[in-house]
Design a protein with these regions (language model features):
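Catalytic cores of the polymerase beta-like nucleotidyltransferase superfamily
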Residues: 1-416
Length: 416
């Protein structure tokens, strides 16, 4: 299915009855934002952001309740989540026009006003970039693009801010500009670039969660995320984000499911703890990032691989991210190395060792020594490629031949 068919199928959930009810109340339904922009770019958009003008939010909520399930998730921001009757998918975001009036310094100090008297143009002018402010009447297909600025920017492959104060009001928009530049391989328009440089230090006021979301998009939705990382340096944002953050060409070769590997490259001259603080990473993701960073410093051989993985939880995710980085380097992946070890009869972990902890306990060995002996046997099996119970136990007897082994013999053979 092409993007036009997908777009049409998405709009079909706004039934003719709903459209007629909106029209009878003096309202109009428009698509706005990413879906319209992506239509010009020939890309499939998962977003179906709709805006309904000319109706107060309370009346709109009442109207939508007749056609499905509606939740008011942000009355102060005029956001409704709508599931039409019979539809089981994700709800559609429907908003009413709003304006934001600054009440002080900082992007948190503003008052939101919404209502049927606020026009579509006022809504468009409060958005971040011209390419994201194009609206489309879903009835007629007519485009509403102030002075054609949005289409012009898309044609010229550039990102320009609508209001120079936008970065003061919400500094995250600076990172969004960088993210879009990387994602679409657009340039940032000259005046917009100046405004970002002027306000760069304000990026420190952005919450870690919002920062991570935008940074993740820059990696996952870009063919060349290095475009974005280079722009972080060029705009001056980098020194306020991670002073020693790095641009690494391997970033462009990583699998898009390997965000921790991307972070490991980005922060390779920093620490996983700093990255965790910067991005508010989950403990799991932070451990994966640290593991990838540690593996890059490892003298890779069979024994060191086994030692390395023996300390890890979430091994499958760690291996997947290390694999992604090794593929980017055109190196043999960790998965391939582990497969080779198994084919040579070498255990890659204690579970694969021919002697278990229970085997040692059954022979009368003290529990506190079991771990020490198992570690010795695992290393021995990896070094020699001999993962055989008799061989391993014989070597254990030689290694631990004092009073410790006598206690085993005493129990096994009733020696006094």
């Amino acid at each position: 299915m092409g993007w036009m068919q997908i777009l049409k199928a998405s709009l079909d959930i706004i039934t003719s009855e709903l459209r007629q009810d909106v029209k009878s109340m003096g309202g109009k339904i428009y698509q706005i934002g990413g879906a319209v922009r992506d239509e010009f770019l020939g890309k499939v958009s998962k977003d179906l952001d709709l805006i309904i003008t000319g109706i107060d939010i309370e009346d709109l909520q009442e109207l939508l309740n007749k056609h499905g399930k509606v939740n008011l998730v942000g009355k102060s921001f005029g956001v409704l989540k709508f599931n039409p009757t019979g539809e089981k998918g994700e709800p559609v975001d429907i908003v009413v026009p709003r304006i934001e009036v600054s009440t002080g310094e900082g992007h948190k100090d503003f008052e939101v006003k919404l209502g049927k008297d606020i026009t579509l143009e006022e809504e468009q002018l409060r958005r971040d970039f011209w390419m994201n402010a194009i609206a489309k009447d879903i009835e007629t297909g007519e485009l509403v693009d102030i002075e054609g600025r949005g289409q012009l920017d898309i044609k010229n492959k550039q990102i320009s801010v609508i209001n120079p104060k936008a970065f003061e009001d919400d500094p995250l928009r600076m990172l969004r500009a960088v993210q879009f530049a990387a994602r679409f391989e657009f340039k940032i328009e000259e005046e917009t670039m100046k405004e970002i440089k002027k306000n760069a230090q304000k990026i420190k006021t952005v919450s870690n969660e919002r920062f991570q979301e935008e940074f993740r998009k820059m990696f996952e939705k870009s063919l060349k995320p290095t475009i974005g990382v280079k722009l972080l340096v060029e705009t001056g944002l980098m020194k306020h984000i991670l002073s020693n953050g790095k641009v690494n060409p391997l970033m462009d070769k990583l699998d898009k499911n390997a965000f921790p590997a991307f972070l490991a490259l980005f922060g390779e001259d920093s620490s996983s703890e700093k990255l965790q603080d910067l991005m508010k990473l989950s403990n799991k993701d932070a451990k994966i990032v640290k593991a990838v960073m540690d593996f890059q410093k490892l003298d890779v051989n069979d024994l060191n691989i086994v030692r390395f993985l023996s300390k890890m939880t979430d091994k499958s995710d760690i291996i997947r991210n290390i694999d992604a980085l090794q593929k980017a380097k055109n190196q043999k992946t960790l998965s391939e190395q582990l497969k080779s070890m198994k084919s040579e009869g070498k255990p890659t972990n204690l579970k694969e060792l021919a002697v278990s902890g229970q085997d040692l306990l059954d022979k009368g060995l003290s529990g506190r020594k079991v771990g020490e002996i198992l570690d010795f046997l695992l290393e021995l099996a990896v070094k020699t490629g001999k993962n055989d119970e008799d061989f391993l136990l014989e070597r254990a007897k030689s290694k631990f031949s004092g009073e410790l082994w006598k206690s085993i013999l005493k129990k096994q053979y009733n020696i006094k």
